[in-house]
Swiss-Prot record:
Pfam families (UniProt xref): Dala_Dala_lig_C, Dala_Dala_lig_N
The protein's name: Vancomycin C-type resistance protein VanC2
Matching InterPro entries: ATP-grasp, ATP_grasp_subdomain_1, D-Ala_lig_Van_CS, D_ala_D_ala, Dala_Dala_lig_C, Dala_Dala_lig_N, PreATP-grasp_dom_sf
Binding site for Mg(2+) 2: 310, 312
Record-listed Mn(2+) 1 binding positions: 297, 310
Amino acid sequence: MKKIAIIFGGNSPEYTVSLASATSAIEALQSSPYDYDLSLIGIAPDAMDWYLYTGELENIRQDTWLLDTKHKQKIQPLFEGNGFWLSEEQQTLVPDVLFPIMHGKYGEDGSIQGLFELMKLPYVGCGVAGSALCMNKWLLHQAAAAIGVQSAPTILLTNQANQQEQIEAFIQTHGFPVFFKPNEAGSSKGITKVTCVEEIASALKEAFTYCSAVLLQKNIAGVEIGCGILGNDSLTVGACDAISLVDGFFDFEEKYQLISAKITVPAPLPETIETKVKEQAQLLYRSLGLKGLARIDFFVTERGELYLNEINTMPGFTSHSRYPAMMAAVGLSYQELLQKLLVLAKEEVK
């Protein structure tokens, strides 16, 4: 295994997150002792064009790579193990492994995984079904409930006529604060914490900007705890982390700028709670058929109750992101983590 295609960008609200994650991974792989032959494949934000990019890595980091016309050429995915067609060179590029470092829409929802299945090439991460299920929070919570993992009380809102009545009934039962969340979005995009009736309309509008279905969810007073898992059949469970906030919630700005948030790895949890988090995380991972990697997030209340929040099948992947930090805490360096993911991708097709 030598030829690796790193795939980044795409038509997603998390496009810039993909660029940051991909840049970190590329830097680490370029300096790896395994001497990889890397192909950098960027997908334009409109998702219409794919390019093989051979320019400076800094252009990817700064999102100027598309302007570097001298170092990009259009490519086209091919089916049946034939890799990609290079339009200018009139030849194919056939990587040993595809490594999609894409977040959110089209990157984590099973879309690009389905394409890779048609291409018949090994790829890093979860398959079509696992990716799609984890991206759809409503279905994820139904599946979790079926195996005994609870989530916060939630209803699904679409643009049906009785939407207002549903909202009023939910708030009457559960009170404020509540959260409005796009059913399919990542990095906390489109999520609003609502504390009064006057904030509902704008929160609903914001959430519907990202998805045609919206979750209305009860606030769980507790600490957000993450658990990283690596593997296919044999699993490596990373250290749990804990997120503490001065105010608000862990939104997009907090996730990537850490304005008032503090992330602690390992999380300062009682041993019984830590064990329970890791057991439920592994149960979800195996039951949902996840492969490669995932970060599974819970809320833990003062009484020690666990509530599933979400599952990220391609969590943020810079060298200082939460998932790599969880693995580093159990002795797996960033470079070793990348190598392991590539090996797992090849193992999955044997």
